[in-house]
């Protein structure tokens, strides 16, 4: 009984603490037509301190989305265009000699921002990708002999173009695993497309004004960590991830020869974190199975390795996650 009272109190507190989410979503909706899944993914990454890898063709509002979010939170935004000639110093910063001061000074790179858009991350060599991914992991960078902490909150949204694969440097599996979510962005619907045309040829873009602060986001993160996850939900998360490793144990023998490797414990951790953030966005103090299912594809699609047999049969990690979710027993 005491637990029920605790959850009720937590629900009330989370409803109060998550009020700003409504303002953020309505602010995003004023600027971005459709792309609700992209907006939700950005909020999940922001509230659970995770980074996002986006895959979609150019022109689907990826840049506009993260820029608008940074403006709504009154924080710093930067965009890094990854190219084959980019150097790690172009991302994290370097030491430059000042003739006036007659000494070397630190010039901080574009990674020193709250929201960083790493555009076409697979266009730059591995050493540049590693520089950014290390900064994402450590939340700090070393320039010369000095170490600098990155701003807080710090959210990286990296993009990849799924069509153009020539002259690219695919991210290694170990690096991709550092992204909490991999989100596939689709085209807008017909009605959304008409609205986009109308808004872009008839008027100016809506003016974006801050609706919350970075400090409020940091407070919200601590509340998200209090969202209740029942032991049965923990078991459900563990079962889903285990089914990516040992599908035959869950009545999915046909998937055994399709998966070369499954999700690591990082997948379980991120699935729980993302489900908590999703519950918070829905203004609930506890996680339900639907929250786990809602984020499972984005958390797992880049953490499942496919065999040659799967690729030859045109089976995707997307389909594998769907089969697992439909088969694993829901509490």
Predicted regions and their residues:
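Conserved C-terminal "switch" segment of AAA+ ATPases
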Residues: 10-18, 31, 168, 182-254, ...
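C-terminal engagement/docking regions of AAA+ P-loop ATPases
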Residues: 1-14, 247-331
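Walker B catalytic acidic pair
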Residues: 56, 119-120, 131
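Conserved alpha-helical scaffold flanking the Walker A/P-loop in AAA+ ATPase domains
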Residues: 41-44, 97-117, 146
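Canonical AAA+ ATPase core
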Residues: 98-102, 120, 124, 128, ...
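P-loop (Walker A) phosphate-binding loop of NTP-binding proteins
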Residues: 57, 91, 159
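Pre-Walker A (pre-P-loop) alpha-helix and adjacent loop at the N terminus of AAA/AAA+ ATPase modules
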Residues: 13-60, 242
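Walker A/P-loop
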Residues: 46-83
